[in-house]
Amino acid sequence: MLDVNEFDKLRIGLATADDIRNWSYGEVKKPETINYRTLKPEKDGLFGEQIFGPTRDWECACGKYKRVRFKGIVCERCGVEVTKSRVRRERMGHIELAAPVTHIWFFKGVPSRLGYLLDIAPKDLEKVIYFAAYMVTKVDEEQRHQDLPDLQQEFDNEIANLEKRRNAEIEERAKKVEADLAELEAEGEAKGSARAKLRNSAEREMAAIRTRYDEQIQRLSAVFDRFKTLKPGDMEGDVDLWREMEDRYGDYFEGCMGAEAIKKRLQDFDLEAASKQLREEIDTGTGQRKARALKRLKVVNAFLTTGNKPEAMVLDVIPVIPPDLRPMVQLDGGRFATSDLNDLYRRVINRNNRLKRLIELGAPEIMLNNEKRMLQEAVDSLFDNGRRGRPVTGASNRPLKSLSDMLKGKQGRFRQNLLGKRVDYSGRSVIVVGPSLRMHQCGLPKPMALELFKPFVIKRLVDQGFAQNMKSAKRLVDRADSEVWGVLEEVISEHPVLLNRAPTLHRLGIQAFEPILVEGKAIHLPPLACAAFNADFDGDQMAVHLPLSAEAQAEARSLMMASDNILKPADGHTVTMPSQDMILGLYYLTTVIDGAKGQGRVFSSLEEAEMALDKHEIDMQAKVLIRLPQDFVLPKDWEPGEVKVVDPEPGSPDVVKEERFHDGSVLFATSYGRILFNGTLPVDYPFVNEQAPKKRLSKIVDDIATRYSTAQVAATLDALKDLGFTRAPWSGVSFAFSDVIQPPELDEYIEKYEGEADKVNENYEIGMLTEEERRQELVDLWTKCTSEVSEAVEEHFDSKNNLAIIVQSGARGNMMQINQIAGMRGLVANPKGEIIPRPVKSNYRKGLSVLEYFISQHGARKGLADTALRTAESGYLTRRLVDVSQDVIVREEDCGTKRGLTMKVGERDAEGNLHLVKAADGGPYSRLLAADVIDPADGETVLYKAGDALSMDVLNDLVAHGVEEVKARSVLTCESKRGVCAKCYGWSLATNKLVDVGEAVGIVAAQSIGEPGTQLTLRSFHSGGVASASDITQGLPRVTELFEARTPKGEAPIAEFAGVVKVEDTERGRQVTLKPDDDSVEPIVYPVTRRAPMLVKDGDHVEAGTQLIEGSVDPKKILRILGPRAAQVNIVEEVHTVYRSQGVDIHDKHIEVIVHQMLRRITVIDSGDTDLLPGELVDKARFKAANMEAVKNGGKPAAGRPELMGITKASLATDSWLSAASFQETTRVLTEAALNQKVDDLKGLKENVIIGKLIPAGTGLARYRNATVEPDKAIRDTIYPNFGLGGEGTDSSFGDTDLSDVDFSNIDFGDLKLGDDFNPDDFLDDNGGQTDLGDTL
């Protein structure tokens, strides 16, 4: 079999009949599959062993040759080659067709490639292929031209002859009438009626004669006229006319029906001439004609440049895929389950064999044509069932799955088997919390670990002598003997495992942990890892995977350990934050209660304070004074203060002061709880002497994450977690019904506002308010009432209330929920998203009335349905984003560009003071400067140089110096040919360091945007206000709209050019007229609705691109008017706005990566002297290269315009046909790719995953492929501190050893011959340790 590492590119093209025969190992002649008596494949059938190989390894069909020693022999009795049965997955067969058939992809695909090439409408083509019309394939024009005068003469003579005969017959009939009349008169019966009857009858007969001859003349004229103008490609549906023409002039032309006609046309088709003619048409034509010529030229050019043969679109031979890919399985009841393909192949073979027989029998043409049509339909069904006409169905009317269906869709070969493989060495189980686990550890159930590490355990058991061989070791493992567990402990030590929770929405959904053996059957997960996995313990399951090779383990340990993945790649904030119980415990510790036991007491040391606490003399939350040593880092702005003493002893002061002593130590006022809390933070971190609810804690952890190494951050987080869990029970927080305190004035508030609501309703009744105004006033009224009740609820919750502690600490819940429990539920929305003006006046403590319950549930249920829909919609968005950006990899260190984006770093408030912009951490942060930053104070001093990174400290420093804008590098301005460069991308937000070459930043970007997708709303909100614009799309639909580059709903117009605005109201609405500054341009009128809020006033002067009314702007118009950079920036800002409105932080650089891919292509307008075609969509790099080549050769460069493509379109337009085919529209992509003989360079991730190669990202990059790992003792000891690798005094069986227990005399050195003077002791030094081997061997 072909090794994937032996090729760098993959080409797809059209297979000719010879190619198919070369692939094949034999012709399938019979429709039989297997013999139902012997259950063996039938000879020459669809499963024949002679063609496809033996069904059993190393055994022929008749059993004459068995065993591997006969490898390669072909049995002379049964004709089967002795080889492995797996060849039945690779070997192909073929069917020789009795009549050619067209390939349905090229005929029926949209657009029809056959139709374009031959310039025939698909309808007409269908008539020819399915035997409803004849097609002229060849005309001997020279001979016809030469013989035409003679033929004309012959035709004229024949016509004259016919006319002569016609006239003679009529004349004869006329004479007979005269004779009959004379006879009547002679007999004396000359009545008028009899004569009239006779005359009428004669006239009718003469008219019939005339008609008969006229029809013959007409038919002859029609045949001759048709023949005179006949040219190749002409079609004729009139069978009689065709036969007449064939009988008379068959020597001058050839023609037939079906695929045979198409084949002949394709064989004679002159591609060069067609290309030349089409190019002329493009140069001279306009409109539809030019557009069609362009499309045709694309197809003609494809054949010209690739060497594909057009006639390969018509098949004489069809391939039969290997039998193991279309298996037949025996079921329990003796019946067989078979792949649909076997039925489809069977239909083809049956019809083909029948056709062959009819041809041999010399059956009439009509029968043959019918059989050929049926064969064509059978092959169509095999290739793409249902593409034309009714699909072929199996039992229970289910359409059979054709070859195309096996590739298409989620269950197709691409997505099911190539991109979604099953993995060995994996398991899955329910997860439970492991509060005692460190961040980098996970608990693995013993039975699961034993199964996963089985091969390792077996090897170790044999190595350590517990078993003689593998077989007995396996028995030990199966019995789970006691020694097995000890060996398992040893094997799993330092061997990381990967844990994954579905859905894996971002890269933190798979992380590495060190396994710890645990009892039971559940996986134990450290609590700090839950946020990254979005895991909870209500029955969630997780999968475990085992990295096997040393490289895989090293990669898992260095890149994927949970303790290293502390920052979220989407925004750079910490993802491993203490939560819930931990926060409660830490909040309790850092809270100081005034008047607590022991307040104001002074201690000479921490130890003394601890002793006092143990003896219950002071409270954990009491403010005491403790003398701290000089190396203690105090808060930045600490100044000595005073502490009031509770219950001072007689004669003692009632106030104690903080002070600093001459030896540097300080008497510091804090609580013992805060001392404990600070004990978990790094030693040199400033003392945190304040309460630490969730928000404060988050800031502390973020700060530590930016200032300290990952190992220190992980240690701090573990310490915080342990302390939080330990102290949470000490707080004694639990909450009961009595903790829910309802404000006593609640009823008063409700009565007061009910009165006001009655007044509003009265005003409405008497006509003073409209329905819309009444509704708005009621909504405003009850919103005010709810907020007042909420304030009252908050006032009545004192700081000691358990419910208040839970909420204030940030452990769980918020005041809004408390208000619903203890205050009033307030206004609720209906399923449309409109606010119902009737409020829910009760709270959950009192209980809701039936009506209140109903209106509450109505909207709530819609919310649940929405969530389910949103998940699917968001998943699909993520899939498209991944597909469009999967080949964006950091390919080089620096692209060398001097370009960048201008970004705001400071903004001024109302007083004019400069502050850091709100979204600094999502914009300029983590980028590199594209230009030096000059101090605005003197205009000379360089504050920071180009290439410096913008950290938060640098940004704050810039604002302090009065800098408002900087020019920073961006993915949008990167000039790398493929992917992006490290300097334009900036820092990796997951590490806060410059991104590594090889980082798959495209996929990280797609995950960062897609992962929070489910949090976005699905609705398009109706504002409910009077002066608002129409419904503005928000949430997920808006993000989709932007990334798909669609024209937004309720589009806001922008000024096409600079000019003066005139706003005027009309009968139907309002219109904005833009009068240009340049008189040569016509003014433009924009109709807008009266409700739309205007952004310009009458008489304003506006610049090109100015938005005229509120709403969403079409990015395609921005691209046309203001250029690509403005369009890119607009999309980035709009997407960011949507996410920020939902409280989701995403760094702009992720959105930029996607937008960069959307504007990667250029539409060629004028091809100049390049090989590009007008109207063709080409990659920027290819466009640039073609132009440079043209200029170099002194030619004219091509002209083009940038094209904004939606992510779906951009994914399908990718250079990689493998990637595009595995995304959507598989058959269309493969048809197009085969026609153009596309080559896949295998530069992206998907295409390498599909063919089973290492992905060209991370350590899979070519530059890292042959890296060798050198052990470094110092580093090794820091990474594996508990492993005993070279550590002092370790007794680990894997550590350094003195080798004294090794018996060198029994070592088998294979082919290595030892000298007679060989002495094992030469290898040991005086202490029994190993010496330098030198040249001993």
Swiss-Prot record:
It catalyses: RNA(n) + a ribonucleoside 5'-triphosphate = RNA(n+1) + diphosphate. GO terms for cellular component: DNA-directed RNA polymerase complex. Its cofactor is Mg(2+); Zn(2+). It is an enzyme of class 2 (transferase). Its EC number is 2.7.7.6. Keywords: DNA-directed RNA polymerase, Magnesium, Metal-binding, Nucleotidyltransferase, Transcription, Transferase, Zinc. Pfam families: RNA_pol_Rpb1_1, RNA_pol_Rpb1_2, RNA_pol_Rpb1_3, RNA_pol_Rpb1_4, RNA_pol_Rpb1_5. Coiled coil: none annotated. InterPro entries: DNA-dir_RpoC_beta_prime, DNA-dir_RpoC_beta_prime_bact, RNA_pol_asu, RNA_pol_N, RNA_pol_Rpb1_1, RNA_pol_Rpb1_3, RNA_pol_Rpb1_3_sf, RNA_pol_Rpb1_4. Transmembrane segments: none annotated. Mg(2+) binds at D536, D538, D540. GO terms for molecular function: DNA binding; DNA-directed RNA polymerase activity; magnesium ion binding; zinc ion binding. GO terms for biological process: DNA-templated transcription. DNA-dependent RNA polymerase catalyzes the transcription of DNA into RNA using the four ribonucleoside triphosphates as substrates. This is DNA-directed RNA polymerase subunit beta'. It comes from Bifidobacterium adolescentis (strain ATCC 15703 / DSM 20083 / NCTC 11814 / E194a).
